[in-house]
Amino acid sequence: MKFERMDCGSVHNGPLAEGCKHCVEGGKMVLFITGRCDTGCYYCPVGLSKKGKDVIYANELCTRNKSEIIDEAESMDATGTGITGGDPLINVERTVNAIRMLKEHFGPEHHIHLYTSTMDMERISAVVEAGLDEIRFHPPLKQWAHMDETPLRDIVMNLSIDVGIEVPALPDHKEELDALVTFAESIGVDFINLNELEFSESNWDMMEKYDYDLVDELSSAVKGSGDVAHYIMKKHTNIPVHYCSSTFKDGVQLRNRLLRKANHSAKEYEVITDEGTEIGRAHV
């Protein structure tokens, strides 16, 4: 399996998940559907303004207005939506309604993927029936080496949409991550996404508690996370693995989304910067 290097240190050893292809191009709106989650991962990077709170964000816009969500997607000419949280399946009715709304407005080609820690087939079936195209499971760390005790095998067997695993590459849990990927490969999971572990305002205490350190003074990435991801990628060549660096998320995905929005909505008198911001054109 060929390794393909991308910008900002990201790399993958096989085809990218369809949802990732849209993200790389800046085409995915991020729909944060709720900050509520029952998993309680110590490394969760969700900001304090969202974590544990029942709030909705369409990209950077805090809203509960359906038309504003559609407007935000239209403003960036979105080709798809990534539904995240918290755990979107905590409020399955809201998530189902959002999927239906987006599909009805933009059509079946609008690609929707969702992140969840929930392995409840009834809730999963509800979002699939609403039009979900891709689901990414985030099992809690305590399950990584014991996935055969979870219902994931049966879930994968009974789903017709793309199924992936997306977790951070924890530098001190290489063996558990290896076990998780081995299990995923054995049951036919379509892809693995490994995110570089990052410090944020809500998980900063893990630096002292788990003896984590920064890659360097200019980065929020945790030292050793990338090394673990590369180890897993080299060992598991029969399943597509994508390592997404912290700098890739900001330097490529976010930048491309901002550029896409600026190009789609800028006025004739505005100039778009390389970072995707809009400034007024000076007249002499």
Regions from the PLM with identified roles:
Residues F3-V11, P15-C62:
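Canonical Radical SAM [4Fe-4S] cluster-binding loop centered on the CxxxCxxC motif
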Residues A17-R36, S67-S75, G80-G82, G86-I90:
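A short, flexible N-terminal coil/short beta segment enriched in small residues
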Residues P45, T95-G107, V128, L152-L159, ...:
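Surface-exposed amphipathic alpha-helices with a cationic face
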Residues V96-E104, V189, S246-Y269:
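Short, electropositive alpha-helical surface patch
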Residues T150-V252, Y269-G276:
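Conserved C-terminal portion of the radical SAM core fold
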Residues A282-V284:
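Conserved small/polar residues in nucleotide/adenosyl-binding loops
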